[in-house]
Amino acid sequence: MATQHPIGKKTACVVGGTGFVASLLVKLLLQKGYAVNTTVRDPDNQKKVSHLLELQELGDLKIFRADLTDELSFEAPIAGCDFVFHVATPVHFASEDPENDMIKPAVQGVVNVMKACTRAKSVKRVILTSSAAAVTINQLDGTGLVVDEKNWTDIEFLTSAKPPTWGYPASKTLAEKAAWKFAEENNIDLITVIPTLMAGSSLTSDVPSSIGLAMSLITGNEFLINGMKGMQMLSGSVSIAHVEDVCRAHIFVAEKESASGRYICCAANTSVPELAKFLSKRYPQYKVPTDFGDFPSKSKLIISSDKLVKEGFSFKYGIEEIYDESVEYFKAKGLLQN
């Protein structure tokens, strides 16, 4: 059993600490002087937790064993915390049974964590990482449409049409809706952060799938390029943010007393052909494809972060910086030539 943190420090629990977003969030919280508890499924998995063990040098970080399917496993890590960041989500893109592999565990995981929050009297606010996939997938027609926090993905369309990888947007949408329902019924101060596709660099030993997807036009990975096209066709745009800005947004809305509701975190909206043109010009040394035939060259919609910006948040990274860092990260990983 981990001992309590010293009194006087703000304490945060980050659920799912081995992930791309969560591990950087842990790092930023430690750098801000927080005491941090984080949960992982298997603390004995050296490959998965080595980067967290290194972060213990930055400050007061305790690692707990917890599983989204086991409500009681969150009691100890959440006890005494001011903020709880629920970042973990089950992802099985190749699943043949998304209902049981992703949707049910995501919803159950959110409810289990929030139940533990109701029992820990210290928790002031819960911050849930949702996804633009919970906002943008609907049957809106036209171009130049602006979507914001009022919009929700159309679950009936997803579950009836079952487009490729439909389980992920369905799980994120239903998990966020379950969180809002539980928060209202149990008087929890909940905020959701809604990031778009994330890139930059990662503390994890494995390359996150989202950076792989964002980098596909540069690496020439046909399977992932088709994934980007599918994203544009399904959600209406290729929208992107730097993972550090997404983590900064989580901390910003946790600390900002006036914050409430949902917050989209998106730095740039584009399309596959527009992005390819930009990347081809910026990195001529990589043979970025620019001919996409009759594939739509304009995005159908803009995902707006106006609410977050009006609250006082400012983005550190535009699309140039996002890709410069992602390219350097891929070079360091040996996935790109100089």
Swiss-Prot record:
It catalyses: a (2S,3R)-flavan-3-ol + 2 NADP(+) = an anthocyanidin with a 3-hydroxy group + 2 NADPH + 2 H(+); a (2S,3S)-flavan-3-ol + 2 NADP(+) = an anthocyanidin with a 3-hydroxy group + 2 NADPH + 2 H(+). It holds the Pfam family Epimerase. It is an enzyme of class 1 (oxidoreductase). Its EC number is 1.3.1.112. NADP(+) binds at T18, G19, F20, V21, K48, V87, A88, T89, P90, Y168. Produces the terminal flavan-3-ol monomers required for the formation of proanthocyanidins or condensed tannins in leaves and flowers, as well as in the skin and seeds of developing berries. Catalyzes the double reduction of anthocyanidins, producing a mixture of (2S,3S)- and (2S,3R)-flavan-3-ols. Hyperbolic binding of NADPH and NADP(+) to the free enzyme, with a single binding site each. The most likely enzymatic mechanism is sequential ordered Bi-Uni-Uni-Bi, with NADPH binding first and NADP(+) released last. This enzyme is strictly pro-S stereospecific and the reaction mechanism involves two hydride transfers from two distinct NADPH molecules. GO terms for biological process: flavonoid biosynthetic process. It comes from the Eukaryota. The lineage of its organism: Eukaryota, Viridiplantae, Streptophyta, Embryophyta, Tracheophyta. Belongs to the NAD(P)-dependent epimerase/dehydratase family. Dihydroflavonol-4-reductase subfamily. Pathway: Secondary metabolite biosynthesis; flavonoid biosynthesis. One of its GO terms (molecular function) is anthocyanidin reductase activity. Gene3D superfamilies: NAD(P)-binding Rossmann-like Domain. SUPFAM superfamilies: NAD(P)-binding Rossmann-fold domains. PANTHER family: ANTHOCYANIDIN REDUCTASE, NAD DEPENDENT EPIMERASE/DEHYDRATASE. This is Anthocyanidin reductase ((2S)-flavan-3-ol-forming). Keywords: Flavonoid biosynthesis, NADP, Oxidoreductase.
